Amino acid sequence: MTNVPVSRLRNFCIIAHIDHGKSTLADRLLQDTATVASRDMQDQFLDNMELERERGITIKLQAARMKYTATDGNEYVLNLIDTPGHVDFSYEVSRSLQACEGALLVVDASQGVEAQTLANVYLALENDLEIIPVLNKVDLPGSDPEKIKKEIESIIGLDTSQAISCSAKTGLGVTDILQAVVERVPPPKDTLEQATQALIFDSYYDPYRGVIVYFRVTAGSISARDQILLMASKKSYELDEIGIMAPDQQKVNELHAGEVGYLAASIKAVSDARVGDTITLLNAPAADPLPGYTEAKPMVFCGLFPTDADQYPDLREALEKLQLSDAALKYEPETSSAMGFGFRCGFLGLLHMEIVQERLEREYDLDLIVTAPSVIYQVNMLNGEALMIDNPATLPDPQHRDSIEEPYVRMEIYAPNDYNGTLMGLCQDRRGEFVDMKYITTDRVTLIYEMPLAEVVTDFFDQMKSRTKGYASMEYHLIGYRKNDLVRLDVLINSDKADPLTTIVHRDKAYGVGRALVDKLKELIPRQQFKIPLQASIGSRIIASQNISALRKDVLAKCYGGDISRKKKLLQKQAKGKKRMKSMGKVDVPQEAFMAVLKLNS
């Protein structure tokens, strides 16, 4: 099965914005090449996770090997590497592009070029891939292929004279795509005689076989009984099996330069087989690893707490298992006076955070409270030390620190120009600094802003979508840290600090946020037998407060008429009891209150 000359191998991926039809096109390619029998076919075939199907997005990377007989009569082997399209998973995209020589750029013929498409196209151009433009959904009444071709030429600078029109839904133009892959994507370089090097572009955890690694052999060959060495983690393993994805796994004896396959070697955790790492042979190692390996760094942090304290061990176990298959997830234990025991987790972005939370609740049946997302701040201390802080509650007191720096991103928003004003307003509300505005076509515009990441990770994306009726798309990347006048805003409930509600905000916004927080809490916390003060403070200064008035029993109900001193005595006794209650009483804040306030926080 694997004795294919290198000249007949093609490795390619599909680049597309969310909802432009990437997974559907992958389905059609699998069907057209008879890789998957019609009876086994289901929509989004390569998206195995239930969550992926439901949200209609690709989260984990997949690969499939197809055989195709071209018009020249030769049989070619095409390796399709399916990539995620969302900004959070751009590191997954970058490494899968490294395993390819070509890419299909799929653009919705009714919507045009979107932000995510562009971000991934630039990654593909950096990797010197041959890009084939494909206009999808040409069967839709609103499609305008000629206009979109001009857009691709003006924005990306690609020649679209040979762009392929197709409809992944009906199967129109799919054969043209397969033929174009054979004719236009270059074959891998013939490096069979060199020392073995293979690039890991994905891995997942199998409870029975350990970690299954997806890799692309870039030089030399790997056989089923070799001993391998992972160059970044310096760990060696004996192979249990190697094989190809067609798209179900099939064992083979050997894979040589240019081929894509999987291996199992009783590897315990995904973190041992890092994506982007280089595999080589233990007895004849390559001199250098493949370039471009970087570790994915978490950008967004939040606390995860079980609603029921008894579920803490279950949450720990669930996170351990999830981390086996998601090397980008980081976590460490944390405690909070209000929430008990939980974990501080780091994610690549908001979608990643949502997906991890949803998988924990679904696959492990946990009930979770999630604190407001925060980013990593750099705190410069008076003694010259620089601290990196991801939990607002641990920010040092003002008298010990010199300044706080926060991460900034360069944000590009693509939208119809009718929504210019509302988008600029949104960016200014979020402390954005205007950089540039470019007209892509007569009716579409690109806005470029630099803004704090903390303002983006909350609900910026939702706001942008709702203000533009879903037409805008965005892409951002980190550009470094900048000093700002930031303060820690604490919330006190009955004089006790509620850690999960602590946030770091800009001084100009502190009063507005503090006022909104205490007002919201007043609505949500049930009244008690004693008065509860709610306060928002910066350091020792209270900037906003509210009171929840006490429930009061009518102690004078039995005194019809009678002496005033008797009534006074009863009222004083009640006041004394309430005073004692207030000093000893503990306010139970309901879960819904935390959830609602965290939404407001964001």
Curated annotation (Swiss-Prot):
<dbReference type="InterPro" id="IPR013842">
    <property type="entry name" value="LepA_CTD"/>
</dbReference>
<keyword id="KW-0997">Cell inner membrane</keyword>
<dbReference type="InterPro" id="IPR005225">
    <property type="entry name" value="Small_GTP-bd"/>
</dbReference>
<dbReference type="InterPro" id="IPR000640">
    <property type="entry name" value="EFG_V-like"/>
</dbReference>
<keyword id="KW-0378">Hydrolase</keyword>
<keyword id="KW-0472">Membrane</keyword>
<dbReference type="InterPro" id="IPR000795">
    <property type="entry name" value="T_Tr_GTP-bd_dom"/>
</dbReference>
<dbReference type="Pfam" id="PF06421">
    <property type="entry name" value="LepA_C"/>
</dbReference>
<dbReference type="InterPro" id="IPR031157">
    <property type="entry name" value="G_TR_CS"/>
</dbReference>
<dbReference type="GO" id="GO:0005525">
    <property type="term" value="F:GTP binding"/>
</dbReference>
<dbReference type="GO" id="GO:0005886">
    <property type="term" value="C:plasma membrane"/>
</dbReference>
<feature type="binding site">
    <location>
        <begin position="136"/>
        <end position="139"/>
    </location>
    <ligand>
        <name>GTP</name>
    </ligand>
</feature>
<dbReference type="GO" id="GO:0003924">
    <property type="term" value="F:GTPase activity"/>
</dbReference>
<keyword id="KW-0342">GTP-binding</keyword>
<keyword id="KW-0547">Nucleotide-binding</keyword>
<dbReference type="InterPro" id="IPR038363">
    <property type="entry name" value="LepA_C_sf"/>
</dbReference>
<dbReference type="InterPro" id="IPR006297">
    <property type="entry name" value="EF-4"/>
</dbReference>
<dbReference type="InterPro" id="IPR009000">
    <property type="entry name" value="Transl_B-barrel_sf"/>
</dbReference>
<dbReference type="InterPro" id="IPR035647">
    <property type="entry name" value="EFG_III/V"/>
</dbReference>
<dbReference type="Pfam" id="PF03144">
    <property type="entry name" value="GTP_EFTU_D2"/>
</dbReference>
<protein>
    <recommendedName>
        <fullName>Elongation factor 4</fullName>
        <ecNumber>3.6.5.n1</ecNumber>
    </recommendedName>
</protein>
<dbReference type="InterPro" id="IPR035654">
    <property type="entry name" value="LepA_IV"/>
</dbReference>
<comment type="similarity">
    <text>Belongs to the TRAFAC class translation factor GTPase superfamily. Classic translation factor GTPase family. LepA subfamily.</text>
</comment>
<dbReference type="Pfam" id="PF00009">
    <property type="entry name" value="GTP_EFTU"/>
</dbReference>
<dbReference type="InterPro" id="IPR027518">
    <property type="entry name" value="GUFP"/>
</dbReference>
<dbReference type="InterPro" id="IPR004161">
    <property type="entry name" value="EFTu-like_2"/>
</dbReference>
<feature type="binding site">
    <location>
        <begin position="19"/>
        <end position="24"/>
    </location>
    <ligand>
        <name>GTP</name>
    </ligand>
</feature>
<keyword id="KW-0648">Protein biosynthesis</keyword>
<dbReference type="InterPro" id="IPR027417">
    <property type="entry name" value="P-loop_NTPase"/>
</dbReference>
<dbReference type="GO" id="GO:0043022">
    <property type="term" value="F:ribosome binding"/>
</dbReference>
<dbReference type="GO" id="GO:0045727">
    <property type="term" value="P:positive regulation of translation"/>
</dbReference>
<dbReference type="Pfam" id="PF00679">
    <property type="entry name" value="EFG_C"/>
</dbReference>
<feature type="domain" description="tr-type G">
    <location>
        <begin position="7"/>
        <end position="189"/>
    </location>
</feature>
<dbReference type="GO" id="GO:0006412">
    <property type="term" value="P:translation"/>
</dbReference>
<keyword id="KW-1003">Cell membrane</keyword>
<comment type="function">
    <text>Required for accurate and efficient protein synthesis under certain stress conditions. May act as a fidelity factor of the translation reaction, by catalyzing a one-codon backward translocation of tRNAs on improperly translocated ribosomes. Back-translocation proceeds from a post-translocation (POST) complex to a pre-translocation (PRE) complex, thus giving elongation factor G a second chance to translocate the tRNAs correctly. Binds to ribosomes in a GTP-dependent manner.</text>
</comment>
